[in-house]
Amino acid sequence: MNVYAYQLDIVWEDKEANFKKVREWTSRTEPQSGSLLVLPELFATGFSMGAQSLQEPEDGLTESFLKELARDTACYVMGGLVVTRSREKPTNDALLINPEGNRVGHYSKMQPFNMGKEGENYEAGNDIQCFELSGGLRLCPFICYDLRFPELFRKAMMMGNPPHIFVVIASWPNMRTHHWTKLLEARAIENLTYVVG
């Protein structure tokens, strides 16, 4: 399986502008069908603390866009979005869509970046998720600050069917790129598995 990761220069809190950028990227890239397209954490809005005003229900605008993108490219698509759930605050989610445009599943970020007040605006998730793709490939998503918690990755590896690949979507700041690279490498080495980030 080919993986295409898009480092999007996000237009702040402008979903339509960001959808357009993603469309332009897939037009230029022409991904091979059956591949995995990976978009950043909160790709449609940026890492905004305006979660209450940006949240969407399941099957909202951003999920609909991801489903359409998956169908149009015949690829798996993973992207981050702000989702309304039956909780006090919305969640920061990674959503996985299959090439037919159907939801495979979602993961809610378990470790909010509280130094940036994320925990005040987003509800933390509480379950590690692992999804099976075509050919039996198992994928486990995490989001941004989760990367700093190796125990999450070990728990995923201890599940009945451990993942073959971790995908970490993020809005990681440039000033900590060195940390990002080293942490991705560490999670791969510790778990003897592939990591995309």
Walk through the language-model features, giving the residues of each:
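Cys-nucleophile CN-hydrolase/nitrilase-fold catalytic domain and related Cys-dependent amidase chemistry
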Residues: 15-16, 23-100, 106, 173-193
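Short, acidic/polar
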Residues: 17-26, 149-156
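His/acidic metal-ligating clusters that form di-metal
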Residues: 29-30, 158-164
